[in-house]
């Protein structure tokens, strides 16, 4: 009788996994692998039928393993280095801007800390020109190709945040 109950529970657990989408991450991974580049606007991602919620099944939040007040300082410093690294890459590539620009982005990291994807959207009243946005995307692609998140996670994860690009003084 006990063996029969355990077997029934195993079948129920498998059914629950299938219903919650645990079995669908492989098809999502294939869809992500077909993305034309690492950096894409959020609108382009949603046009492909993806949402941040579905992406979270493959790339859970990097901070989800900690409570809000116990996130390691080294993790937060690694994220700040990502943001500052992006700004420094723009400056190093000779990009100039005279108005402050703001964007929100979500980075998707591989277990070794390399960037699999970065999806973003421009925010605020001040918007860059289409030419500037195209150049930004090129620089962003080069930056993402070589960047490695310093805090060791050893699993896929996502981190999001705003990026403020203030003009150089």
Predicted regions, residues:
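Bacterial N-terminal signal peptides that target proteins for export
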Residues: 1-10
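C-terminal motif of bacterial Sec signal peptides marking the signal peptidase cleavage site
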Residues: 19-21
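Charge-biased low-complexity segments
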Residues: 23-169
